[in-house]
């Protein structure tokens, strides 16, 4: 069995697929990628048993259809180091793969293709399409609030929720919450799942910034996304996500509105002298003025005064400045609204002109 392919056609899909592989898999065959040759098309598949990625590309020639495995990292390193215009020929004989290009020749050990695991076929409960850039924006707007290696395993991921014609992503680590909602062109049944953190990071890496379609299939145990030449599949977290609606403050009495760029720069400067561990800053509000102060264990201090629209009572409250900057970097807008109730309440932050994304940050003790 033999096929030929240009380096240009092979490198990108191979890199994408190798990205989902584990560095130390429990099963030796998972060090490999699966190669499926059919009608001059090559499908490359990789998995770590949690996330699976398949990517298709065009062959220059093939002697017959077939399915084989090849060591992923070694094959990728060989392809990466060949010259840009290289033509690569791969020949499979028994338990060996011969990779040739010009005067270069490599013999690699393979594993039986039938031993390669795959996430079995499953029935999707929700199936719809949306532009890739829309899905990417949904994920990027909320992913920074995901927990990382939290004992509450259901927080180590992102909630995907369909409700009528709405698609929503939600992420929280217990200290902050991010919710982003978009409208779809079709009505869907109400359904929600939790995509693991690794699945979220791999998926957003695949999504383009154009309006090419992405087809989402959401099942009970898996989520699958079909892109142009790529199919992404991830297992889901079996757990109950917190009721985020109870966290969103709806009766805030103290409303602050200010310029996004000015606030972002002020918080960024104040953060330089904030405590390295706590990362706390003090927000002091009075009529049409926000004062941001920070200090650290070396008794160094920073103070920033920003003009804002505020007509409530004077108020002092503390927040983690990293959390605030994460929100501001995600918003990228003209005017920002901050909604508070008192010095002990959470703060809701949103774009003044677009409430599709909402962010909640818990206060810190001053």
UniProtKB/Swiss-Prot annotation:
It comes from Haemophilus influenzae (strain ATCC 51907 / DSM 11121 / KW20 / Rd). The lineage of its organism: Bacteria, Pseudomonadati, Pseudomonadota, Gammaproteobacteria, Pasteurellales. This is Beta sliding clamp. Its main location: cytoplasm. Keywords: Cytoplasm, DNA replication, DNA-binding, DNA-directed DNA polymerase, Nucleotidyltransferase, Transferase. Belongs to the beta sliding clamp family. One of its GO terms (biological process) is DNA strand elongation involved in DNA replication. Forms a ring-shaped head-to-tail homodimer around DNA which binds and tethers DNA polymerases and other proteins to the DNA. The DNA replisome complex has a single clamp-loading complex (3 tau and 1 each of delta, delta', psi and chi subunits) which binds 3 Pol III cores (1 core on the leading strand and 2 on the lagging strand) each with a beta sliding clamp dimer. Additional proteins in the replisome are other copies of gamma, psi and chi, Ssb, DNA helicase and RNA primase. It comes from the Bacteria. PANTHER family: BETA SLIDING CLAMP, DNA POLYMERASE III SUBUNIT BETA.
């Amino acid at each position: 069995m033999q096929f030929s392919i240009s380096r240009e056609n092979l490198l990108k899909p191979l890199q994408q697929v190798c990205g989902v592989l584990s560095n130390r898999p429990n099963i030796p065959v998972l060090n490999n990628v699966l190669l499926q040759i059919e009608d001059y098309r090559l499908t490359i598949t990789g998995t770590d048993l949690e996330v699976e990625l398949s990517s298709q590309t065009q062959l220059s020639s093939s002697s017959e259809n077939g399915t084989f495995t090849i060591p992923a990292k070694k094959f990728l390193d060989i392809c990466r180091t060949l010259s840009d215009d290289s033509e690569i020929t791969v020949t499979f004989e028994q338990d060996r793969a011969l990779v040739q290009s010009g005067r270069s020749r490599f013999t690699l050990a393979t594993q039986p293709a039938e031993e390669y695991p795959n996430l079995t076929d499953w029935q999707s409960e929700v199936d719809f399409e949306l532009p890739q850039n829309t899905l990417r924006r949904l994920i990027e707007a909320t992913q920074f609030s995901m927990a990382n290696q939290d004992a509450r395993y259901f927080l180590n991921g992102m909630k995907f929720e369909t409700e009528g014609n709405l698609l929503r992503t939600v992420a929280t680590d217990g200290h902050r919450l991010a919710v982003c909602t978009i409208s779809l062109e079709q009505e869907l049944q109400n359904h929600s799942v939790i995509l693991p953190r690794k699945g979220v990071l791999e998926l957003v890496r695949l999504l383009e910034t154009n309006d090419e379609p992405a087809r989402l299939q959401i099942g009970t145990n898996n989520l699958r996304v079909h892109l142009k030449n790529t199919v992404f599949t991830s297992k889901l977290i079996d757990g109950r996500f917190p009721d985020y609606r109870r966290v969103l403050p709806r009766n805030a009495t103290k409303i602050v509105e200010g310029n996004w760029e000015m606030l972002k720069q002020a918080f960024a400067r104040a953060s330089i002298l904030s405590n390295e561990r706590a990362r706390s800053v003090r927000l002091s509000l009075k009529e049409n003025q926000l004062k941001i102060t920070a200090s650290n264990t070396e008794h160094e201090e920073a103070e920033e005064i920003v003009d804002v629209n505020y007509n409530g009572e004077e108020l002092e409250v503390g927040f983690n400045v990293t959390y605030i900057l994460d929100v501001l970097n995600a918003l990228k807008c003209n005017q920002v609204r901050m909604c508070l109730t008192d010095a002990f309440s959470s703060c809701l932050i949103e774009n003044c002109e677009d409430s599709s994304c909402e962010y909640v940050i818990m206060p810190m003790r001053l």
